[in-house]
From Swiss-Prot:
Organism: Gallus gallus
Record gene name: VIP
Protein name: VIP peptides
Signal sequence interval, chain numbering: 1-25
Family: Belongs to the glucagon family.
Threonine amide sites (modified residues): 156
Subcellular location, record wording: Secreted
C-alpha cells in the first residue's frame, strides 16, 4: 500500500517540478519587458556594429551559449540581445542629438562674438573719425588765430621780435628797395588801395 500512496505523491511532485520549470521561463510578474517578438515581428538590425564586425569570423561566446541553452530559455537570450541593441541605438540617438545641440550652441556663441566684435569695431572708427574732425577743426582754429594775431600786429604797427631783427630787415630792404626812391611813411593802406585800378 505504501507503494500505491507514493504514486500520487510522485505524480504531484512531477507535475509541480514541470510547472516550476515552466514558471521559471516566464518573466517575473510586473516586469516591464517589451512585447514578445515573434518570428514575423523580429526587430530589424540595419548593420552590424564595429564590435560585431570584429568578431564576425569567430563565434562569440553568446552564440555558443545560445546553442547550449534549452529551447525555452533562448527567447530570453534573444530578448536580452534586443534590449542591448535598443540601448545602443538609444545611446547613438542621444549622442547624435547631443552633438547637434553642442554644434548649435557653438555656432550661437560664435555669432554672438562676431556681433560683439562688429559693434565694438564700429565704435573705434567713429571715435577715430571724431578725433580727426576735432584735430582738423582745432588746427583750423589755431591757423585762424595766428592769422588774426599777425594781421592785428601788422595793422597796429607792432611786429614780433623775430621780424624786427635788424640783419633780416636789412636783407629784405635791399631786395625790396625800388630803383626810384619814394617815401611811403605818411601813406595809409586805404590811400594805396584807392589808387590801384580795380576792374569790376
Amino acid at each position: 500500500m505504501e507503494h500505491r500512496g507514493a504514486s500520487p505523491l510522485l505524480l504531484a511532485l512531477a507535475l509541480l517540478s514541470a510547472l516550476c520549470w515552466r514558471a521559471r521561463a516566464l518573466p517575473p510578474r510586473g516586469a516591464a519587458f517589451p512585447a514578445v517578438p515573434r518570428l514575423g515581428n523580429r526587430l530589424p538590425f540595419d548593420a552590424a556594429s564595429e564590435s560585431d564586425r570584429a568578431h564576425g569570423s569567430l563565434k562569440s561566446e553568446s552564440d555558443i551559449l545560445q546553442n547550449t541553452l534549452p529551447e525555452n530559455e533562448k527567447f530570453y537570450f534573444d530578448l536580452s540581445r534586443i534590449i542591448d541593441r535598443n540601448a545602443r541605438h538609444a545611446d547613438g540617438i542621444f549622442t547624435s542629438v547631443y552633438s547637434h545641440l553642442l554644434a548649435k550652441l557653438a555656432v550661437k556663441r560664435y555669432l554672438h562674438s562676431l556681433i560683439r566684435k562688429r559693434v565694438s569695431s564700429q565704435d573705434s572708427p567713429v571715435k577715430r573719425h571724431s578725433d580727426a574732425v576735432f584735430t582738423d577743426n582745432y588746427s583750423r582754429f589755431r591757423k585762424q588765430m595766428a592769422v588774426k594775431k599777425y594781421l592785428n600786429s601788422v595793422l597796429t604797427g607792432k611786429r614780433s621780435q623775430e621780424e624786427l631783427n635788424p640783419a633780416k630787415l636789412r636783407g629784405e630792404a635791399e631786395i625790396l628797395e625800388p630803383s626810384f626812391s619814394e617815401n611811403y611813411d605818411d601813406v595809409s593802406v586805404d590811400e594805396l588801395l584807392s589808387h590801384l585800378p580795380l576792374d569790376l
